[in-house]
Amino acid sequence: MQKTTALPLAILLAATTLTACSNGENNHTDNLKIFATTGYLADAAANLAPEADITTMVGPGGDPHTYQPTTHDIEAMKDADLVLWNGLHLEAQMVDQLESLGEKQLAVGDQLDEQDLLPWPEQGKGGEQLYDPHIWNSPKLWSQAVESIGDKLGDIDSEHAADYSTAADNYESQIAAAQDKAEKELATAKPRVLITGHDAFNYFGKTFDFDIHATDFVTTEATKSATEISELADTIADKKVPVIFKDNQANPQAVTSLQQAVESRGWKVTVSDEELFADTLGPDAPTDTYLGAFEHNAHTVAKALS
């Protein structure tokens, strides 16, 4: 999607809402309209409300950290019955605008217990503690996010609240089964060090006992310094890590530079042929769903470190 450089989102949202009201328009249909900032959230919504009309803001390969909404996004948010966003500063460019949507928005990460979240090295504008927003890589936290989505759907559409609750329970059972399968696959992986292109896998590391390092930090536009790359190359060579995992958002130049730095230290490290899925899902099945992407990531790591 193209980036917009027009009026601020909050102003445009207010303007389009006033226009709709003044014209007496009613854009609602029998199906709920759900706007989701990420594919992970859109997939959760589809599992809980399969009849809903769902719009995904950031598609495959996009970066929700830096994404700026288009006019089409603004219209879709205005028309939606429910706007789902990750929160925890993932959608860093549009936090105020999303919060301005009032009761019809839900930041799923903000519903979680801070004690379960991993700290983030950066601070907020007011100096407040930030937390790692990549919660979908923790099956436990993502199940809690699914639960909160089910509750919100029940609030919006109380007639079908029991259906949403049942669907959430069923989906959470599938997530738990995927975690069990991943634990078995990853049990013998060695060394327990995961080198990725994008800094999105810390919850994966916490869940499955991996030490996580990334060539990019926070966003696809924020690369590590030469000193940090050198230190990471030392770690890879010292621990004899056999593979660097590229992902669908990584900076390939950073991955190549790291590989060369490792080889200069006398250790040969390969770059995985199979990419991991970081902030977005894949364009095709099976990685176009949360479960598909999660299982793919676990299997790819297990195979490469077997």
Regions found by a protein language model. Give the residues of each.
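Extracytoplasmic metal-acquisition and chelation regions
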Residues: K3-L9, A20-S306
